[in-house]
From Swiss-Prot:
<keyword id="KW-0406">Ion transport</keyword>
<dbReference type="GO" id="GO:0015108">
    <property type="term" value="F:chloride transmembrane transporter activity"/>
</dbReference>
<dbReference type="GO" id="GO:0005886">
    <property type="term" value="C:plasma membrane"/>
</dbReference>
<feature type="transmembrane region" description="Helical">
    <location>
        <begin position="149"/>
        <end position="171"/>
    </location>
</feature>
<feature type="transmembrane region" description="Helical">
    <location>
        <begin position="186"/>
        <end position="208"/>
    </location>
</feature>
<dbReference type="InterPro" id="IPR001807">
    <property type="entry name" value="ClC"/>
</dbReference>
<feature type="transmembrane region" description="Helical">
    <location>
        <begin position="301"/>
        <end position="323"/>
    </location>
</feature>
<feature type="transmembrane region" description="Helical">
    <location>
        <begin position="376"/>
        <end position="398"/>
    </location>
</feature>
<feature type="transmembrane region" description="Helical">
    <location>
        <begin position="343"/>
        <end position="363"/>
    </location>
</feature>
<feature type="transmembrane region" description="Helical">
    <location>
        <begin position="15"/>
        <end position="37"/>
    </location>
</feature>
<keyword id="KW-0813">Transport</keyword>
<dbReference type="GO" id="GO:0005216">
    <property type="term" value="F:monoatomic ion channel activity"/>
</dbReference>
<feature type="transmembrane region" description="Helical">
    <location>
        <begin position="99"/>
        <end position="118"/>
    </location>
</feature>
<feature type="transmembrane region" description="Helical">
    <location>
        <begin position="221"/>
        <end position="243"/>
    </location>
</feature>
<dbReference type="InterPro" id="IPR022969">
    <property type="entry name" value="Chloride_channel_YfeO"/>
</dbReference>
<dbReference type="InterPro" id="IPR050368">
    <property type="entry name" value="ClC-type_chloride_channel"/>
</dbReference>
<keyword id="KW-1133">Transmembrane helix</keyword>
Length: 418
C-alpha cells in the first residue's frame, strides 16, 4: 500500500500530465503556424515578386506592416491581446481567457514578421490562463496557484525540451518553510514538465547547443576570464535595462497602439537592414547561422550583439507580444564570439557560456535558468564548475539593481497597456 504522502503526490499526477501535454501542443501549433507564415513572408512572396529576401525595402516593409498588424489586433480586440510583456514577469497572474485568441494572433504575427522576441512569455500566459480556467471548473478545490505552477512547469519543459529547467527554477520558488519535503512539492510540476518535454520531443527537438571547440581542463585564469566576460555581458544588459522603461514611456505617449507598433516595426526594420537577416526573429536558429559563418569578424559580432540588444529593447518597449530570453541568448553568443575573436587565448566555450550566463541573468534575474541556458548552449561538463563559480560575482554585481521590466502606471487597468 502506498504511504499517504505518495497518495497525496499522485492526486495531481493526471492533471499534471494533461497540462504538460496540452502546454506542448499549444506551443507546437503556434510555432508551426508562425513557421508557415514566416516562409510565406520571407521566402515565397519575395521570390514570387522577384525581390531579394535581404532587400532593405522588404525588411523595413515587412516589419513595419507587422507592427501595424499587431497594433490593430491589440487596439481592436477584447482584452487588448493580453498584458504588455514589458510590464510582466515570465510567470504572471492568469489573464481572462477572452484575451487569449488575439494574444496568440499577435504572437504569431510577431514571430513570423521577424520581431526580435521569443514565444516564451505569451505561450506561458496562454497556458496559465487555460489551466486556471479549466482546472477551476474540473477540480475547484485545487487553488489557482497550483494550476499556475503546473502550467508554468509544463510550458518550461515544452520550451526547452527537458524537465531539468523546470526542476531548477521551481526548486527555489517552492522551497518555503513548509514541513512538506521539497521533492513532494516538486513531484507534480516535474510530471507536467516531463510530459511537456516528451510531447515536444515527439514533433521536434529544440536545438540549443552550438558547435564550439571542446573545453578541456579548467585553469585558475579561466575563472578570472569568465568573470570578466560575465561582467561585460551584465554591463551591456544593464544598458538595455536603463533604456527599456524610458523608451517604453516615450513610445506610449502616443497612446494609439497601431501608431506605436507601426513606428516600432519601422525602427526594427532599420535595425534589421543594418544587422542583416541573421539579426531578425527570435534568435535560436540565427545563432546557429552566426556560428556557422566563418566570415564574421570581431566588428561583425559586436555589431550583431548591439543590433540584437537594441531590437530587443525596441520590440519590448513598443508592445510586441513576445519573450526576452531567446533573443538575449543570441546577444550572449554574439558577445562571446566577439570576445573570443578579440582575445583568442580565452577559449570560445568560456566566452560564449559566460556571456550567456551574464546577459540571461540580467533579463531573468534567475540564477538557475541562467546556468541552464549557458550549459545547454555550450554543453560541456568541464564548464559546469566554472559557471557555478562565475555566477557568484555576477550575482553580486546585480544585487539590488533594477530588473528588465517596466513598472506599470497605476492609472492604467491591468491589461489595457500597449
Amino acid at each position: 500500500m502506498l504511504h499517504p504522502r505518495a497518495r497525496t503526490m499522485l492526486l495531481l499526477s493526471l492533471p499534471a500530465v494533461a497540462i504538460g501535454i496540452a502546454s506542448s501542443l499549444i506551443l507546437i501549433v503556434v510555432m508551426k503556424i508562425a513557421s508557415v507564415l514566416q516562409n510565406l513572408l520571407w521566402q515565397r512572396l519575395p521570390g514570387t515578386l522577384g525581390i531579394a529576401q535581404d532587400s532593405p525595402l522588404w525588411i523595413i516593409g515587412v516589419l513595419t506592416l507587422t507592427g501595424i498588424a499587431v497594433g490593430l489586433v491589440i487596439r481592436f480586440s477584447q482584452g487588448h491581446a493580453g498584458p504588455d510583456p514589458a510590464c510582466e514577469p515570465l510567470i504572471g497572474a492568469p489573464v481572462p481567457p477572452s484575451a487569449l485568441p488575439r494574444l496568440i494572433v499577435a504572437l504569431i504575427l510577431g514571430l513570423a514578421g521577424g520581431v526580435s522576441l521569443g514565444p516564451e512569455h505569451p505561450i506561458m500566459t496562454v497556458n496559465i490562463a487555460l489551466a486556471v480556467a479549466i482546472g477551476a471548473r474540473l477540480l475547484p478545490r485545487v487553488n489557482r496557484m497550483e494550476w499556475t505552477i503546473l502550467a508554468s512547469a509544463g510550458t518550461i519543459g515544452a520550451l526547452f525540451g527537458t524537465p531539468v529547467a523546470a526542476a531548477l527554477i521551481f526548486s527555489q520558488t517552492l522551497n518555503g518553510s513548509s514541513e512538506v519535503p521539497l521533492w513532494d512539492r516538486l513531484f507534480a510540476p516535474l510530471m507536467a514538465a516531463a510530459a511537456g518535454a516528451l510531447t515536444t520531443g515527439l514533433f521536434f527537438h529544440p536545438h540549443f547547443s552550438l558547435p564550439i571547440a571542446h573545453y578541456g581542463q579548467m585553469e585558475m585564469t579561466d575563472i578570472l576570464s569568465g568573470a570578466i566576460v560575465a561582467a561585460i555581458a551584465i554591463a551591456a544588459g544593464m544598458v538595455a535595462v536603463w533604456c527599456l522603461p524610458r523608451l517604453h514611456a516615450m513610445m506610449n505617449q502616443m497612446k494609439n497602439p497601431v501608431l506605436v507598433l507601426g513606428i516600432g516595426g519601422f525602427i526594427l526594420g532599420i535595425l534589421g537592414v543594418i544587422g542583416g537577416p541573421v539579426s531578425l526573429f527570435k534568435g535560436l536558429d540565427e545563432m546557429q547561422q552566426m556560428v556557422a559563418n566563418q566570415a564574421f569578424s570581431t566588428s561583425d559580432y559586436f555589431l550583431l550583439a548591439v543590433i540584437k540588444l537594441a531590437a530587443l529593447v525596441v520590440a519590448a518597449a513598443s508592445g510586441f507580444r513576445g519573450g526576452r530570453i531567446f533573443p538575449a541568448v543570441f546577444v550572449g553568443v554574439a558577445l562571446g564570439l566577439m570576445l573570443h575573436e578579440h582575445v583568442p587565448a580565452v577559449p570560445a566555450a568560456i566566452t560564449v557560456s559566460c556571456a550567456i550566463l551574464g546577459i540571461v541573468l540580467v533579463v531573468t534575474r534567475d540564477g538557475w535558468l541562467s546556468l541552464f541556458m549557458a550549459a545547454v548552449v555550450v554543453p560541456n561538463t568541464t564548464l559546469l564548475p566554472l559557471l557555478c563559480i562565475v555566477m557568484l560575482p555576477a550575482w553580486l554585481l546585480l544585487a539590488g539593481k533594477p530588473m528588465m521590466m517596466v513598472n506599470r502606471p497605476k492609472q492604467q487597468p491591468p491589461h489595457d497597456n500597449v
